Curated annotation (Swiss-Prot):
InterPro entries: Glc/Gal-6P_isomerase (IPR006148), Glucosamine6P_isomerase (IPR004547), Glucosamine6P_isomerase_CS (IPR018321), NagB/RpiA_transferase-like (IPR037171). Pfam families: Glucosamine_iso (PF01182). Belongs to the glucosamine/galactosamine-6-phosphate isomerase family. NagB subfamily. The gene is nagB. This is Glucosamine-6-phosphate deaminase. Keywords: Carbohydrate metabolism, Hydrolase. It comes from Shewanella sediminis (strain HAW-EB3).
Length: 262
């Protein structure tokens, strides 16, 4: 894994956005894996600005989101389809029919999971997958104990995840306890993975992901198996890593090398 430690959340978002901008400039018909939550919002703003400046275009892009609450229609304000429309899709030149989010209102969720995998395969696979990380190390809605080679499926959310996401729902509003999520195996199939994490509350999860053993108790630790995974984190999220200075040294040397390449 490539570990990039930056000062704060603004630098993390800018660095992450630049990775996606370079990908779209290199391959205009890229297949993007996208994520929701508070961490990617600033990254999406960077992509919107780049699109407005005509540095990139999304006209030929296909996107697949990681997950969706089971039981919410795409028009529900807390659905991830609604989130993506509001935070990104409504502000760029992407064709909405080429944006896919797991159907939270599917009549047969099990069939919908199989169909989602088939759509990803038909698109040629995901070129670059964006991830956040939960306090318990979950990626997507792959909670601890998830199989490390799992595929898109229905998952029950843990108490910790439900509590973390409760702030998005009103006290009298239904909050789903089930989801449809890409599996860890689905995520690992992406050609490149970019995980963003900020804040001290993510420090334990980052420690387990980077320096802990490969284990189902920390789903994000599966990224140790990926040949092109980049973790972009701020100082607070990196605060419990024992080799912070070494990771910074490696990244500095990598940047020097990249600057010399044609």
């Amino acid at each position: 894994m490539q570990i990039v430690i930056l000062k704060d959340s603004a630098e993390v978002a800018a660095y992450g956005a630049n990775i996606f901008i370079k990908q779209l400039q290199k391959k205009t018909n890229s297949v993007l894996g996208l994520a929701t939550g508070s961490t990617p919002v600033s990254l999406y703003r960077g992509l919107i600005e780049a699109c407005d400046a005509e540095l990139i275009s999304f006209k030929d892009v296909t996107s697949f989101n990681l997950d969706e609450y089971l039981g919410l229609k795409g028009t529900h304000p807390q659905s991830y389809r609604y989130f993506m429309n509001e935070q990104l899709f409504n502000h760029i030149d992407i064709i909405k029919a080429q944006t896919y989010v797991p159907p939270g209102d599917a009549e047969n969720p099990l069939e919908a999971c199989v169909g989602y995998e088939e759509k990803i395969k038909a698109a040629g696979g995901i070129d670059i997958q964006l991830l956040g990380i939960g306090r318990n190390g979950h990626i997507g809605f792959n909670e601890p104990s998830s199989g490390l080679m799992s595929r898109t499926r229905v998952k029950t959310l843990t108490k910790a995840t439900i509590e973390d996401n409760a702030r998005f729902f009103h006290d009298d509003e239904y909050q789903p306890h089930l989801s449809i999520t890409m599996g860890i195996g689905t995520i690992l199939d992406a050609k490149k993975v970019v995980l963003l994490a900020t804040g001290e509350n993510k420090a334990d999860a980052i420690l387990a992901t980077v320096e802990g053993p490969l284990m189902a108790a920390c789903p994000a630790s599966a990224l140790q198996l990926h040949t092109d995974a980049v973790l972009v984190i701020d100082e607070a999220a990196a605060s419990k890593l024992s080799d912070r200075d070494f990771y910074k040294h490696i990244e500095n040397e990598n940047q020097k090398l990249m600057a010399k390449l044609p």
